[in-house]
Regions:
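Conserved catalytic/acceptor-binding region of the Class I
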Residues: 149-218
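Helix-to-beta-strand junctions that scaffold the AdoMet/dcAdoMet cofactor pocket
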Residues: 70, 127-128, 142-144
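A short glycine-rich, Lys/Arg-flanked "PGG" loop and its adjoining helix->strand segment in the class I
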Residues: 132-147
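Conserved alpha-helix/loop element of class I SAM-dependent methyltransferases that forms part
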Residues: 30-49, 64
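A short acidic, Gly/Pro-enriched loop at the edge of an enzyme's catalytic core
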Residues: 109-118
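N-terminal, positively charged/glycine-rich alpha-helical extensions of SAM-dependent methyltransferases
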Residues: 1-28
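C-terminal helical/coil "lid" or tail adjacent to the Rossmann-like core of SAM-dependent
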Residues: 13-17, 21-23, 207-265
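Class I SAM-dependent methyltransferase SAM/SAH-binding core
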Residues: 52-54, 58-108, 133
Length: 281
């Protein structure tokens, strides 16, 4: 189990929309091992592979991928956050065949070598302007015949029924603000296929799964994740939140009431897209 004393962040990054003192906690709690394994199997992960986890965060996902490629597989996690890297190394980096590197996936990664399988999950949504360039850069790290797998959300945070009218009006404004101000991409999921197609990948395949699918009594981990999102929104889009009837307090109250209402329905589509690097490229 990860050490709870190390879950809080000691530093911030101006590049990451969701940065907060408790981001390590949020990432650890929200990652569903069973769902992740199902997604990785669809993507084609196999024992013995050399895997790159791009944007590995706290390393929990990297550790699960490491388990799936045994025996004889190895995995490398890369992230730009010193806080996340420190946590990942301490909690997941002590097993044979797993290592973590501080780095920027927008720059050359030749020092890491080539991989049979590259996993890019919940990363491109934070790089709306650079997403296609990141994919093309990662392609250089895929061995000919290897797989690049992109997984991300579409219509992020916007699929709910039946929201109070003020929430219905403000949520799209908040997401639009995040897109423009923080380089986020609310609709990146629908773009993944084109990223692989335009980057010259072959045998491209796409699947659609539910990421959030919340009905009836809400699970503690889902409530925690959404509450943290509200807190971040309040800080990053303060003017918008203050324009809500009743201000932040009413916004938070309305959203919390909606989340705990068992009649509520919330979902977020997850797009999975994989492609093979041709031997000719």
């Amino acid at each position: 189990m990860p050490k709870m004393s190390n879950l809080k962040n000691s530093s911030r990054s101006n590049e990451y929309l969701m940065e907060s003192e408790e981001e390590n906690i949020r990432l650890e709690i929200k990652t569903d091992p069973e769902a992740l394994r199902k997604q990785a199997l669809w993507c084609g992960i196999k024992p013995g592979m050399r895997v790159l986890d791009a944007g590995c965060g706290t390393g929990k996902t990297t550790s699960i991928l490491h388990e799936m490629i045994q025996p004889d597989g190895c995995v490398v996690g890369i992230d730009f956050s010193e806080t996340r890297m420190s946590f990942a190394k301490e909690n997941y980096g002590k097993k044979k065949g797993i290592e973590f590197h501080l780095g920027d996936f927008r720059k050359s990664m030749k020092n890491l070598g080539q991989f049979d399988f590259i996993w890019v999950r919940f990363l491109l949504e934070y790089y709306r302007k650079e997403a296609i360039d990141i994919v093309k850069n990662l392609k250089k790290c895929v061995r000919p015949g290897g797989l690049l797998c992109l997984l991300d959300l579409d219509y992020n945070c916007l699929n709910h029924y039946e929201l109070p009218v003020p929430l219905t009006r403000i949520l799209p404004k908040i997401m639009n603000y995040a897109d423009k101000k923080y380089n986020f991409d609310t609709f990146v999921g629908r773009k993944l296929y084109s990223f692989l197609y335009d980057s010259g990948f072959e045998k491209i395949d796409v699947a659609l799964m539910a990421h959030n699918l919340i009905f009836g009594e809400i699970k503690d981990k889902d409530k925690f994740n959404w509450v943290k999102k509200v807190e971040i929104a309040a800080k990053k889009a303060e003017k918008l939140i203050n324009s809500y009837p009743g201000g932040y307090q009413q916004f938070s109250s309305d959203l919390n009431k909606f989340l705990i209402d068992p009649r509520r329905f919330t979902y977020t589509p997850l797009l999975l897209c994989k492609g093979v690097r041709p031997f000719s490229s």
